[in-house]
């Protein structure tokens, strides 16, 4: 990168095209504005900052990105399930690559990304699409997992899973296989435990750079109902994708993330699933008579915490998703440090249809992209 050039500052992000936060009431108007002039996060010369509350106008080219905000919510990558000697086995192929991601209209971020041939984006394209966040890998407690990793990028990378596994499978420098050099491959193998809402990310050095560039994704381990009894077994069935009780729940994944577009160690863009204001331009439709289950993960670099606040409603929260009973009941805001995660459950039963806002309750984060809407429908 040319050291004489800087990326996009807060001021420039807002210059790409903006309206005041008061304009949130006119959501429909945001969907019909002219696209912004393309801006590279590595070659636009800027300086200064502006904390003015604003949001972008225009549209991100999701087709160019190869993935869509609404698709990221619902795409669970189950890999290739099988059986060996009577035991359930599940395998994935994960590839790390370098690519640009459009994170706001006309604003491109030079990312390092994970892709999988069994993600919705890759299946649709007929080739592996690298995405941020990476594919949501989903399995069942007790399964034997094999993750075949290929580093097709230009820097050493790893896969580090949050869960229980041996030191040899930890995916950290200097232990086991350690960092995987460009062109290298390695298979991570371990048992899926404990059940819960987990994550994976690159653990190569420098760690903050590899995470900030986009090498992370959700890792969900469904509980095995056969290991539970009574009411807990029924709850486990509703959290396990193989059971009909799970089909009655609307499940979503949001990874809270952010982007330092001028590489000064501070974020200029914040988002839910990478695209600034992605769920303002396309609100998330939810049926008011259906239980909503949100797998929420914070992978924001450079800021100590991120948060979720839902307007006009309250939710139950399961920290790390490793319990079948809520760890917090009837709250409307929760905060997470980096890599903290949990399950948010709520319903709009009895509510009138309409747009219900949700966002980070750090006001700056909301003003710079981490703002969204649920659209409650009958």
Question: Can you annotate each of these PLM segments?
Answer:
Residues 1-12, 16-23, 27:
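N-terminal secretory signal peptides
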Residues 253, 257-263, 271-315:
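Surface-exposed interaction/gating patches
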Residues 120-125, 232-239, 343:
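Surface-exposed intrinsically disordered loops and tails
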Residues 84-88, 140, 180-181, 193, ...:
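Extracellular/periplasmic catalytic domains that process cell-envelope and extracellular macromolecules
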Residues 18, 22-157, 165-167, 177, ...:
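N-terminal, post-signal-peptide metal-ligating segments of extracellular/periplasmic oxidoreductases
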Residues 167-171, 313-324:
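Short aromatic-acidic-glycine turn motif
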Residues 146-157, 164-230, 333-378:
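Extracellular/periplasmic metallocenter environments
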Residues 42-70, 81-84, 212-257, 338, ...:
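Extracytoplasmic/periplasmic copper-protein system
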């Amino acid at each position: 990168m040319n050291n004489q050039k800087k990326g996009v500052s807060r001021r420039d992000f807002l210059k790409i095209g903006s309206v005041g936060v008061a304009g949130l009431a006119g959501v429909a108007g945001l969907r019909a504005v002219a696209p912004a002039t393309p801006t590279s996060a590595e070659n636009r010369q800027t300086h200064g900052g502006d904390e003015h509350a604003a949001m972008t106008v225009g549209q991100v080219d999701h087709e160019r990105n190869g993935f869509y905000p609404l698709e990221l919510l619902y795409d669970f990558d189950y890999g290739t399930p099988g059986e060996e000697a009577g035991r359930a086995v599940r395998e994935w192929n994960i590839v790390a690559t370098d690519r640009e991601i459009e994170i706001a209209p006309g604003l491109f971020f030079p990312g390092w990304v994970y892709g999988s041939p069994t993600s919705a984006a890759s299946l649709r394209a007929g080739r592996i699409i690298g995405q941020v966040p990476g594919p949501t890998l989903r399995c069942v407690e007790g399964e034997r997992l094999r993750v075949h990793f290929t580093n097709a990028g230009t820097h050493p990378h790893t896969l580090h899973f949050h869960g229980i596994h041996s030191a040899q499978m930890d995916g950290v420098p200097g232990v086991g296989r350690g960092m995987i050099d460009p062109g290298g491959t390695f298979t991570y193998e371990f048992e899926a435990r404990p059940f819960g809402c987990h994550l994976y990310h690159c653990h190569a050095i420098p760690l903050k750079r590899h995470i900030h560039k986009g090498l992370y994704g959700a890792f969900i381990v469904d509980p095995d109902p056969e290991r539970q009894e009574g009411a807990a077994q029924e709850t486990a069935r509703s959290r396990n994708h193989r059971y009909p009780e799970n089909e009655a729940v609307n499940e979503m994944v949001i990874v809270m993330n952010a982007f330092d577009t001028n590489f000064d160690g501070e974020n200029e863009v914040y988002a839910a699933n990478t695209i600034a204001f992605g769920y303002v331009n396309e609100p998330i439709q939810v049926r008011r008579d259906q239980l909503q289950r949100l797998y929420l993960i914070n992978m924001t670099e450079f800021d100590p915490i991120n948060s979720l606040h839902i307007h006009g409603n309250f939710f139950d929260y399961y920290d790390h998703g490793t319990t079948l009973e809520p760890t917090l009941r009837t709250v409307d805001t929760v905060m997470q440090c980096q890599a903290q995660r949990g399950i948010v459950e709520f319903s709009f039963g009895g509510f009138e249809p309409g747009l219900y806002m949700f966002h980070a309750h750090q006001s700056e984060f909301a003003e710079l992209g981490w703002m969204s809407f649920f659209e409650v429908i009958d």
